[in-house]
Amino acid sequence: MDIRLDDIGRQFPPHWDEAQAARGKTAFFKALALEAHRFYGGKIQILPRAPLPGFQWFNAWYTPGVSAVSTGIRDNPDESFELSWRGNVVAVVSDSTRVLGDGDVSPPGGLGVMEGKAFLMKVLGGVDAVPICMDSRDAAGRHDPEILIDFVRRLTPSFGAVNLEDISQPNCFRVLDALRESCDVPVWHDDAQGTGCVTLAGLLNALKVAGKELAQ
């Protein structure tokens, strides 16, 4: 089999119909995912962006030199987007209550999907992303959207944007609305807004093909 898996369809018996082949691919990729994730220990890591030409550079990247960065951002908070990773990093945040077709998978259970979203952002868009799965349950064990809202608000000084992911309804809408009102960085809910964008794009293209206006 080609390591790129381009020939995956040819690995199944030729008498399989389309539905059988689809189920076979799903089973194959689930088994592969477990082995590959175990082998690599997840999909992402953090690597230094800046070089270290010599030992003395530690004095610039860390103390005492970095004090100028800290006070510079203190005096002008917008400098955080130029002097730190904030200008190119997104927090991918979930409480893991509605993960794909698996539902509530527990907070750490969502890490595979959040890592996957971070992986896509980096490979396809060149944007760094940090997967964060948090526990939004209150003392009674109920998922409280206010806990998630407060958590994300407190994270935003470290990130340039927030991508909300796999949060169950109706909490997802409440969380998105509250954070968009109160955060000073863009907040996006992939499952709601992403799906909406794709649906709208499909509708607009269909109207072009049909030669009709949206009002019709």
Region roles according to the model:
Residues 77, 183, 203-210:
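Structural motif corresponding to the C-terminal cap of alpha-helices
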Residues 212-216:
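Short helix-loop-beta connector
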Residues 188-205:
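A glycine-rich, Thr/Ser-enriched phosphate-binding loop motif common to dinucleotide/cofactor-binding enzymes
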Residues 1-2, 199:
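A composition-driven signal for long, intrinsically disordered, charge-rich low-complexity tracts
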Residues 2-185:
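N-terminal ligand-binding/catalytic initiation module
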